Amino acid sequence: MKKTKIIEQEILINTTPHEIYEAFMDSKIHSKFTESKAKISREIGGKVSAFEGGLSGKNVELIPDKKIVQTWRSEGENWPKGYYSTITLILEPVDKGTMIKFTHVDVPEGAYESVKEGWDTYYWESLKELLE
């Protein structure tokens, strides 16, 4: 694998950790806020698919309402075939809602900008619209 990068973000959303966890783990809610078909298993080792199959992966660690760790890969042209990155969401209740401590490690350097923009546009902005 060529060079990789890390995306680290903290996102405050004015809702409960449970609502954010469900948005990521419930196929119907995930499909609604990303405006594309998603199929999400709730089992460790279970498959994750979003954006009509353009993103796929597996659940590595799930602690309801607290933590989600998944492997992810993209079908995009800047993503090596068969290569997986890892996302981690830690959900912390705070006074004004929930702080998402997010990391996405092993992002291929050539895909970094589009992946980072995708998180901002398709996830954080859309989640805020849906849940706040």
Predicted regions and their residues:
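A conserved amphipathic terminal alpha-helix motif
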Residues: 2, 106-132
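Short beta-edge strand/loop motif at the mouth of beta-sheet-based domains
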Residues: 2, 8-9, 15, 27-58, ...
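Hydrophobic residues positioned within well-ordered beta-strands of beta-sheet architectures
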Residues: 7-9, 70, 87-89, 100-102
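A short, structured loop/turn motif at beta-sheet edges
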Residues: 14-18, 60-66, 90-99
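Hydrophobic pocket/interface hotspot
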Residues: 20-21, 30, 48, 59, ...
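A short, polar/proline- and glycine-enriched secondary-structure boundary/capping micro-motif
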Residues: 32, 60-62, 79-83, 110-116
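Mid-chain, well-packed structural core segment of small domains
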Residues: 69-90
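Short, solvent-exposed aromatic-acidic interface loops
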Residues: 73-76, 103-110
